[in-house]
């Protein structure tokens, strides 16, 4: 069974993810990124998809043109786990050149 983060673990781990925000009404985090164009956005999504498949942990996401919205939560644990933190850190590195979406 996957360990859901405690309130204290969640607080500590999320301090290292300042670009992510809590999803109202869910134990989940979200981030939106804006790229130069669709090709950049799709390339980013491809890199994340490869990592997610390696981790067997898949994001909820939505893409329109150059914008990618991502939500992370672990369904098996009904909330945030270390897997979400690991994937969020990878997403931050992979999307380092992106702008925050408004």
Swiss-Prot record:
Q: What is the lineage of its organism?
A: Bacteria, Pseudomonadati, Pseudomonadota, Betaproteobacteria, Burkholderiales
- One of the protein's GO biological processes: tetrahydrobiopterin biosynthetic process
* Gene3D superfamilies reported in the protein's UniProt record: Transcriptional coactivator/pterin dehydratase
This protein's source sits in the domain of life called Bacteria
Q: What's one GO MF term for it? A: 4-alpha-hydroxytetrahydrobiopterin dehydratase activity
Under the heading InterPro entries, the entry gives: PCD_sf, Pterin_deHydtase
Its Enzyme Commission number? Answer: 4.2.1.96
Q: Does the keyword Lyase apply?
A: yes
Family from the record: Belongs to the pterin-4-alpha-carbinolamine dehydratase family.
Tell me which UniProt keywords the record has, alphabetically: Lyase
Put simply, this protein is called Putative pterin-4-alpha-carbinolamine dehydratase
From the UniProt record, list the reaction(s) this protein catalyses: (4aS,6R)-4a-hydroxy-L-erythro-5,6,7,8-tetrahydrobiopterin = (6R)-L-erythro-6,7-dihydrobiopterin + H2O
Naturally occurring in which organism (per UniProt): Burkholderia lata (strain ATCC 17760 / DSM 23089 / LMG 22485 / NCIMB 9086 / R18194 / 383)
């Amino acid at each position: 069974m996957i360990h859901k983060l405690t309130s204290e673990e969640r607080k500590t781990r999320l301090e290292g993810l300042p670009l992510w925000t809590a999803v109202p009404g869910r134990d989940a985090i979200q981030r939106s990124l804006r790229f130069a164009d669709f090709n950049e956005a799709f390339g980013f999504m491809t890199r994340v998809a490869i990592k997610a498949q390696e981790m067997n942990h898949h994001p909820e996401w939505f893409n329109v043109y150059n914008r990618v919205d991502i939500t992370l939560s672990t369904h098996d644990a009904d909330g945030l786990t270390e897997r979400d933190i690991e994937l969020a850190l990878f997403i931050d590195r992979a999307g380092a050149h992106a702008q925050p979406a408004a």
